[in-house]
Amino acid sequence: MELITKFKDVLLIFNMKKMDNPSLFGEIQKVIANAFNLPCAEDVFDNQYSYIVSIDKDEDNEVVSGYRHILCKNARCGKSFSLNTFKYYDFSSDFSQNYADYTLELGRSFVNISAKKRIWGLFSIWESGLGPLINYQTEHNSIQYILGQVSLKENIYDLESIKAILKMFWVNFGTTALLIPRKPTSSPAELETFNVDSKLDFSGDYKSDKVKLTKFLKEKEQAKPTLFLSYADLVDGKKSGLSCFLPVYNSLLKCYEMGFLLKISEISPENREKYLRSSYNPQAFE
């Protein structure tokens, strides 16, 4: 377990595996179980994935937030992949042959809802953990893409809002290539034609569609899908920078999930400067 860097000189950002610190890993699992209302958070992937985790040194080393990650090439098993995403999506031959070896999967993320500094949550992980990770893997393993899933939980969003969010991202970034959902919740036609009123007549221009969606959700007193928007904003809403795949339903977490693939070279200069910091401890990722 190695320190990557610090966030605001208060949160310590580490990269670790289960075997590095079983005690801390146990605390992480308790936080995840509490955040997602699970009896047990540990799963079959925890022995192979790494965790980037933020620790509050001023609060008795309280776990604040974290992200799970792995290089797809390290999870390849013949024609299969031991990846969380692979549970929900089948990989096309194009993805397996031309993308997988250059792709970093970001697994589940979490924030300790009881932590004193939870407001820094995933931002601290992105700025001081994932940014350095992406820099390192780009330089040392020729990584070009980020693969993951973004969730919309039923206890946070009503179904109408979920469909509106999925439609907006599908209209702007949707593709049926590369990843094929094993059990899709919607067809492309269903996503494209869903409409509740004229406010949801998305044009495919991300910036204007983002305004429409945000206004629609605000009127319904529903939260903005921050993580969804963050990935799109990283590439300034460019279609060449982000691909979204047909949604699936996660019955364990009771949420709809949409897979995505982000092209690292399309991250905007402003966001590169903000997140992809070059000052960090590279030994944390060796």
Task: Please give the residue ranges for each predicted region.
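Acyl-donor binding region in acyl/amide transferases
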Residues: A75-D236
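A short helix-loop-beta-strand connector motif used in the catalytic cores of GNAT acetyltransferases and
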Residues: V44-V53, R76-G78, K239-L242, S251-M258
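Catalytic micro-motifs at enzyme active sites that drive phosphoryl/nucleotidyl and oxygen chemistry
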Residues: C40-V44, Y51, D90-Q97, P247-Y249
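Short, cationic low-complexity segments
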Residues: S278-E286
